[in-house]
Amino acid sequence: MPSCMRPSEEQSAKQKAIDDWLPITSSRNAKWWYSAFHNVTAMVGAGVLSLPYAMAQLGWGPGVAILILSWIITLYTLWQMVEMHEMVPGKRFDRYHELGQHAFGEKLGLYIVVPQQLIVEVGVCIVYMVTGGKSLHKVHELLCKEPCKEIKLSYFIMIFASVHFVLSHLPNFNAIAGVSLAAAVMSLSYSTIAWSASVRKGVQPDVAYGYKAKTAAGTVFNFFSALGDVAFAYAGHNVVLEIQATIPSTPEKPSKGPMWRGVVVAYIVVALCYFPVALIGYWMFGNKVEDNILLSLEKPTWLIVMANFFVVVHVIGSYQIYAMPVFDMIETLLVKKLNFSPTRLLRFVVRNLYVAFTMFIGITFPFFGGLLGFFGGFAFAPTTYFLPCIIWLAIYKPRKYSLSWCINWICIVLGLCLMILSPIGGLRQIILQSKDYKFYS
């Protein structure tokens, strides 16, 4: 029977069918608390465990100031993102690059946002591969007493990746809600273990709070790298519009209400995780703290094993949160631009290849601390600290020297400093660590 639909209607129906298949737009029935634990899972992760180490590189005064300032600035820029999601009546900017295209034009917006967002999301997935593998390795070390065969870190990263070869086939954000909730609970749990176990261990006899580096250059470079560690700890902006896209919206009840409620709850949890871990961890261990606080804690063994296991569960959820927008980008390109059919086979191939790629890079370059500093400044600073402000200024055009104009420009200047300085320190740290590194060890 011939179709009675006009070509335009047929095209529209085809477009809707594709949107219903793509991960970001396929399900819009999320509750406000979904946004809370998705944001906690996206934000609290490997970054919190490096904060005492960052404090050791920054020192008490600058460290506390930067932690608080970052919390305030990123909450403000996250509010901007939530507000701009439905700034055009009848339209939703479901993806970060769609907002960028509205602000800067179709092509320029794509070129500005997509490379940065991909660097962030792929970078996070790689770092979390390393984090998951290292935490599993630590569990093995603590539980397996002599005589015990040494197992390479590479194999633990592979074990961690094997979970994602399964979970990555969940179709959308709402489908991974259970994984994300478990991850959010784990983040609060291992953060509590990290600071409470530090308190139990007490202030170390030889504790020192001065800068660890022997040279002025070393101190400066470590300071720069620590800025990236802090930036890495506030990374949720890269997926916030994609998370908000899952919440239902009507003109009477726009999605920004429940989304903002979830963000506020998430930021309270972030504060409860970050500040105690950063301050107590540094207070107890001083400048000898490891780049992952759990590595500084050896006893009680059962508690540290539990904390590392919680980290594994959490970064499983975090990996999925950051991988979902990447899956969406790749699948959109293949289906809309290259005219592939939206099938399960396509999804199976794309997602398995992505997991395999991040696993391979993680195995090859497992420099945890340096990776945080490098990715933190190079990619997170733009998308988290100042790109939302630039988009806000481009669209709303607040009056020059007004409060909104001044706040946004302050955020832009601070974000630019972070973007320029942090990768320098992070790259130096990677180079120093790589001197003693054997590939696939």
Predicted regions and their residues:
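Membrane-interfacial loop- and helix-cap regions that link adjacent transmembrane helices
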Residues: 6, 27-29, 33, 79, ...
